[in-house]
């Protein structure tokens, strides 16, 4: 008699889609969830309408997993899809490392995620020393922590740098409150 096949352990992941529901790229949360279910992932949940997907998988090759998801997004939604893929546990560690005030009535707390560490290094280098009266930027493990004045998140020097085409395929930014919502599941 054959022994029963041992089920592999699944890991909770977070896919952060770059540029969704801005710049004319509109994807409904229900459609996004359906795609991830069709890809065979478990416990799929979308968070907010800004391209955040939580899912379980037993796939361990992060690069292959990221490529598979990006290709499926491109095919289904007909746009140049890029994601940052993280284990939820890793995201929790990144959020815990946020070095600035988490609640500040005058500033937004952001985390810049990257799929290519060299690009994050380059952003830090090109940003140079930022004016702390305007914004704050600090490198963390696999992320950049950024804080900028409310109402100016597209106008500061760091914001303009992050908006450059060069970084679109490898970085995406989330408000710290959004990151914390992604950790509650």
Task: Mark where each language-model region is.
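Surface-exposed, charge/polar-rich loops and edge strands
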Residues: 2-50, 54-185
């Amino acid at each position: 008699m054959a022994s029963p096949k041992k089920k592999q352990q699944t890991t909770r992941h977070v896919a952060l889609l770059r540029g969704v529901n801005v710049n004319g790229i509109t994807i409904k949360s229900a459609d996004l969830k359906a795609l991830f279910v069709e890809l065979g992932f478990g416990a799929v949940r979308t968070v907010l309408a800004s391209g955040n997907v939580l899912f379980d998988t037993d796939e361990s090759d992060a690069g292959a997993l990221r490529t598979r998801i990006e290709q499926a997004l491109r095919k289904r939604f007909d746009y140049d899809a890029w994601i940052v893929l993280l284990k939820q546990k890793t995201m929790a560690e990144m959020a815990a490392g946020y070095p600035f005030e988490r609640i500040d009535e005058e500033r937004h707390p952001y985390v810049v995620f990257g799929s290519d560490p060299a690009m994050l290094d380059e952003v830090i280098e090109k940003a140079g020393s930022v004016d702390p009266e305007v914004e704050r930027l600090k490198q963390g493990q696999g992320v950049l922590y950024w804080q900028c004045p409310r109402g100016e998140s597209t106008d500061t020097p760091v914001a303009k740098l992050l908006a450059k085409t060069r970084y679109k395929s490898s970085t995406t930014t989330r408000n710290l409150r959004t990151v914390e919502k992604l950790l509650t599941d």
